[in-house]
């Protein structure tokens, strides 16, 4: 078993990360690669909970949602996360991982509701828990759901998987002199106006002294290196 720096973590996966190079939907090779990395971390003995977004599915129907009531659109997005959670659960099952999906919206015939004591028991038993439907409320992002669930389950860190390998002093695609921060405090990130998460999620993590690690999900082995405490991505700390 490889060494680990954390016992319990909350992994935030965006729905867009599941698209791979596709315009929307779930790219099969991408989800297989992700589950390989998740399986590696589970094999290290890390208790792993996952919050997943729904942008890859909602993007496909977004043009039809123009002018729609915001709350209605948000509920559609929540249901998209349930579809992603089921797809991820199925892929993890094929890796031999015992996985549970818990939803903030009640769809009892498909997934079980989020019940914190059950979540904690599942994690202690070595099961991977996937949280779906965000917070269950409109106007809150899945980043906020990640911060909330991370605090609720006593995660030691929120791992935010993105398309870039950390937080930079400027947009690295536009500024060749941009440098990656290895570590930065919550207060520094605010002063420098660096976008780590949405404001609500960021404030919740800061208030609960819950550190955030931003790293690239597209970088092979990055998740394992992050959990192992290596210099990967950017750590946002109190």
Curated annotation (Swiss-Prot):
Pathway: Pyrimidine metabolism; CTP biosynthesis via de novo pathway; UDP from UMP (UMPK route): step 1/1. InterPro entries: AceGlu_kinase-like_sf, Asp/Glu/Uridylate_kinase, Uridylate_kinase, Uridylate_kinase_bac. It is found in: Cytoplasm. The keyword Cytoplasm applies. Keywords: ATP-binding, Cytoplasm, Kinase, Nucleotide-binding, Pyrimidine biosynthesis, Transferase. Inhibited by UTP. ATP binds at residues 12-15, 55, 59, 162, 168, 171. Belongs to the UMP kinase family. Homohexamer. This is Uridylate kinase. It comes from Bordetella avium (strain 197N). The lineage of its organism: Bacteria, Pseudomonadati, Pseudomonadota, Betaproteobacteria, Burkholderiales.
